[in-house]
Amino acid sequence: MITAEMVKELREKTGAGMMDCKKALEDAGGDMDKAIELLRERGLAKAAKKASRVAAEGIVESYIHGNGRIGVLVEINCETDFVARNEEFRQFAKDIAMQIAAANPKYVSREEVPLDVIEKEKTILRQQALNEGKPENVVDRIVEGRLEKFFEEVCLLEQPWIKNPDMKIKDLLTEKIAKIGENIVIRRFARFERGEGIEKAASC
């Protein structure tokens, strides 16, 4: 039997509507973990529909790390000013700024990586595989696998979240879209590191 307390607990854990929580619990036979999974699956579908909506509101979040050693600015957009003031949205923006400071991505998504950069990386990875003595017929598969690791390093959305490495940033974003109920877009960011690109004068 599904109780009101179970529905309330599931709602608190997921942010989903009461009726959605009740239906998920019924479909899961009262299993809380399974109900959460069902809501996430259904939430992902909702998030995909919301992704086509225009997100022109939002905030520019800043984060300074390590006694002024690293600074980040990130613009995150949503659909309404109401959500831009929402505490959960603002915390999400802080988490993303901290992620950028810690993981040093170069691009928001893999779609932003220039084709010439991808081709250059493929050439390097192919040569590495050949130098390791890998058979020619499996080199392309090895290159594709290592290219995925490259995207995980340089693309913010592909990176494992520093607070929960089992989840990628794109999964966190999708979860927030489903929970908050609006399209959310990580538009752009800038990361500064003290002394970056400056050659220190050699001491005499």
From Swiss-Prot:
GO-annotated molecular function: translation elongation factor activity
Gene Ontology CC: one annotated term: cytoplasm
SUPFAM superfamilies (alphabetical): Elongation factor Ts (EF-Ts), dimerisation domain (SSF54713), UBA-like (SSF46934)
CDD domains (UniProt xref): UBA_EF-Ts
Region (Involved in Mg(2+) ion dislocation from EF-Tu): 80-83
Record's keyword terms, sorted: Cytoplasm, Elongation factor, Protein biosynthesis
Cellular localisation: Cytoplasm
Annotated PROSITE patterns: EF_TS_1, EF_TS_2
Claim: Protein biosynthesis is one of the keywords in the record: yes
Function, in words: Associates with the EF-Tu.GDP complex and induces the exchange of GDP to GTP. It remains bound to the aminoacyl-tRNA.EF-Tu.GTP complex up to the GTP hydrolysis stage on the ribosome.
NCBIfam families referenced in this protein's UniProt entry, alphabetically: tsf
Family to which this protein belongs: Belongs to the EF-Ts family.
Name of the featured protein: Elongation factor Ts
Naturally occurring in which organism (per UniProt): Caldicellulosiruptor bescii (strain ATCC BAA-1888 / DSM 6725 / KCTC 15123 / Z-1320)
Lineage summary: Bacteria, Bacillati, Bacillota, Bacillota incertae sedis, Caldicellulosiruptorales
Gene transcribed to yield this protein: tsf
